Amino acid sequence: MLRILKILLFFHVYNGLWSQTIPPIQKYDLQEYEVGTQNWMITQDDEGSMFFANNEGLLELSGSRWRIYPNRNESIIRSVKSIGDRIYSGSYMDFGFWVKDAKGNYQYTSLVETLNIEILENEEFWNILNYNNRIIFQSLNRLIILEPINEEVKFIHPKNPILKSFKVMDRLFFQESQSGLFSINNGQAELVNDQKVLKKEILVGLFENKGKLLGLSNQSCFYEIENNSITRWPSQIETLKEKLTFYSAAKLGDDRFALGTISNGFILMDSNGKLIHHMDYSSGISNNTILSVFDSAQISAQFIFQK
């Protein structure tokens, strides 16, 4: 039976009729959850509750109930990740975790304070990854690797800014500006590929596809990456008339790709590069910039964040 794709969009309500070729869409208006106008990242706990890195704090969607937990320093939460019974978050010059108390409310503990971690000036944490029983907090300047059991902390300091970090095929990768793609091996950064394209374009997504490493650049090109070679991987998004700039991407549980653009909406593509849907303002999306995409396995839905 064909799986129905549900897309939940934030901030705008649209009352028009959908074409039969467009998947059903449910939208949440800003007034429904009454918090910041931008969500930067999403995660889901084992009970199915959704958590969003919101401009005003940690935003929770449990069933139909929205709830906001303000960040302790009142800064924007940039990253969020559910691991076990904790919801980890990263923000401006701080990162830590949230745990539910006896009343069902989430309380925050700063790992920066608890572990006496020296934070760099104006450092923000844009991604959180769970890898080999370690938790990785990524800022533009470095990777902070935490072993939560013994609270041991290690640091990786590239010489140039970190553009993105990924967990793919049981490996941890990061892209360093002007240097290329690196992986982490035994706590050390090792160069994977320093081809010219990886020094100039930003990888917004890195995936396993049919046993190979597949990267999506912000300049609307897919690349197969192997050892120190890189090959352009053809897809139908290159045939679109618009020049696309990608900002977000996710591989879904059925091997399709959900791709978010700046100013050109949302694209759904299969594992062979075939375009399935391109939804933008003309399809009813009120804002064409997609900050993040997430595949929710428990509720068979895709969440898209709009700017």
Locate predicted features.
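Carboxylate-rich, polar loop motifs that coordinate divalent cations or form catalytic acidic clusters
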Residues: 1-307
